[in-house]
From Swiss-Prot:
The name this protein goes by in its record: Flagellum-specific ATP synthase
Presence of the UniProt keyword Signal in the record: no
Family according to the record: Belongs to the ATPase alpha/beta chains family.
Gene expressing this chain: fliI
Top enzyme category: translocase
Reactions catalysed according to its record: ATP + H2O + 4 H(+)(in) = ADP + phosphate + 5 H(+)(out)
Keywords: ATP synthesis, ATP-binding, Bacterial flagellum biogenesis, Bacterial flagellum protein export, Cytoplasm, Hydrogen ion transport, Ion transport, Nucleotide-binding, Protein transport, Translocase, Transport
GO molecular function: ATP binding; ATP hydrolysis activity
Protein's cellular compartments: Cytoplasm
Taxonomic classification: Bacteria, Pseudomonadati, Campylobacterota, Epsilonproteobacteria, Campylobacterales
Pfam families the UniProt entry points to: ATP-synt_ab, T3SS_ATPase_C
Amino acid sequence: MPLKSLKNRLNQHFDLSPRYGSVKKIMPNIVYADGFNPSVGDVVKIEKSDGSECVGMVVVAEKEQFGFTPFNFIEGARAGDKVLFLKEGLNFPVGRNLLGRVLNPLGQVIDNKGALDYERLAPVITTPIAPLKRGLIDEIFSVGVKSIDGLLTCGKGQKLGIFAGSGVGKSTLMGMITRGCLAPIKVIALIGERGREIPEFIEKNLKGDLSSCVLVVATSDDSPLMRKYGAFCAMSVAEYFKNQGLDVLFIMDSVTRFAMAQREIGLALGEPPTSKGYPPSALSLLPQLMERAGKEENKGSITAFFSVLVEGDDLSDPIADQTRSILDGHIVLSRELTDYGIYPPINILNSASRVAKDIISESQNLCARKFRRLYALLKENEMLIRIGSYQMGNDKELDEAIKKKALMEQFLAQDENALQPFETSFQQLEEILR
């Protein structure tokens, strides 16, 4: 058989195309190379002339060349360095032995607890749950926080956002939710956080107990690709446990820094900046991640809380606006409430849970609605009450709100260590409204 015919037949069954090439051009967040033809999402590696290596993911595939974004920094790389194909798509280790461990988005443990014994490698990018395979959210997901359980009740498989400016208490609230919920598995993605905040979150907010937790960490000094895929890696871990029939709590801090990472990548690729400099891909990436959470028929559930950092407490920020439109509820933290010493500073009037009315009883629903109505009356007339312009007896409902003001504020405030069962929260709510 002629050599050319043999090669053609072999090509039908095996990929004989070259798996190495060379660097052609290096830019701040993207490297261009040629020599082989990878697909978008494939993982490649640069072998630098100084002997070090740099791993990256293909984000541009053209006929004559391809571009990839590095997972780590590319100092020392130069045109002509060898580029090798590593694997098709990014995978991440999963298994029960991940519990209690802290990993980076490359699947490397960073907790000094020895090598990781994992079950298998799972793809990082997967298809969200099909709409008709999603289970109805009909069970309560208690988080141990009075104002959430009583007034913004969450359900198993619900997706919620925690919206707040910097320094208002997002991390503290997320720690309370993690410790207060009854989910057997908790997966936490810390994306774009300062390095010192990682041990602080573990020791202060989680009280050092990681027995039921898996942490995936990409700090602010990591590359944009690490920060982007850290969130997807954590979601893949949550999906593994969900597919085992378990209820999983997924916590991510923060969506804003995740979107900022994609903004850096998108702008490097030449995407046009739109609102506040975010390219279209930064906004379209959000549902790809968030829709993977939820409840699936004949499997478990992923109940997700995504924190969103809003600049200057501006809820019209494009990332905050897009996130709110995707999720099933939003919890807004108010800087004003911190001035009154109310922690966690949840603004119940600006917050909402879209499934609450479907999972609590009619009497519980009436209690929650009445509390919000009385609290809204207090806020609307706060100035009149403070300056003494309101006379008791003019409005029966406002009179009731004024009498119950101290009790309502006491209900909204909660020490971070004083977590309590769902039933206790509603008993206290009923006692206030009697």
